[in-house]
């Protein structure tokens, strides 16, 4: 979707007969805020930034996004130390408003939480989406902006041109071999989920 904003020829090659039938169909829809990844990693950077952008994407594309917030419960001092580590990770990663809360606030936010919980990491920026709705909205927007969608086209092979993957001219560097036809391209983004290897 983002690349469709530029003067490029783009093709989304999908193995299945429609979008979101791979790893996306098993996604629970929780938009993680970014307190889990180790600070400084690419995952930390894209996780926190992605969570931040979901509100904008929802407005632009018309899918439902709700900032539900999340709690990670702790039941003893060891858990509290782990929650503090997650809080520090999150703050380093740019996650806003993380805090450690006590039993009273836990039950104010979630009355059915375990009565044994002594503390929790509260993260108000965590959100929830329907992963199918997001994938469909993003692809529809991309197609409306000139992206080609090739379905039922599992990639059987990727051939690299003699110039190699770093060829200097404008000729295609890669050929994706699929039963639906071959796709020649200069750049290849592998977003195949579990089939990406």
Segments the model singles out, each with a brief description of its role:
Residues 8-10, 97-98, 188:
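Hydrophobic anchor at the start of a short beta-strand
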Residues 14, 67, 101-103, 151-153, ...:
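Short loop/edge segments at beta-strand edges and connector loops
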Residues 121-187, 191-195:
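Helical element adjacent to the flavin cofactor pocket in flavoenzyme catalytic cores
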């Amino acid at each position: 979707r983002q690349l469709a904003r530029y003067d490029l020829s783009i093709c989304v090659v999908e193995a299945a007969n429609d979008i979101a039938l791979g790893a996306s169909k098993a996604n629970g829809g929780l938009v993680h805020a970014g307190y889990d990844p180790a600070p400084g990693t690419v995952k930390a950077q894209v996780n926190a930034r992605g969570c931040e952008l979901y509100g904008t994407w929802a407005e632009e594309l018309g899918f439902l996004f709700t900032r539900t917030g999340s709690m990670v419960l702790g039941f003893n001092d060891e858990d509290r130390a782990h929650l503090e580590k997650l809080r520090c990770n999150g703050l380093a990663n740019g996650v806003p408003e993380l805090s450690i809360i006590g039993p009273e606030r836990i039950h104010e936010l979630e009355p059915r939480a375990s009565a044994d919980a002594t503390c929790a990491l509260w993260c108000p920026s965590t959100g929830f989406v329907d992963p199918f709705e997001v994938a469909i909205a993003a692809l529809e927007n991309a197609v409306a902006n000139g992206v080609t969608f090739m379905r039922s086209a599992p990639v059987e092979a990727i051939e690299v041109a003699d110039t190699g993957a770093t060829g200097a001219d404008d000729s295609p560097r890669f050929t994706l071999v699929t039963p639906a036809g071959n796709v020649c391209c200069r750049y290849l983004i592998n977003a195949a989920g579990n089939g990406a290897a």
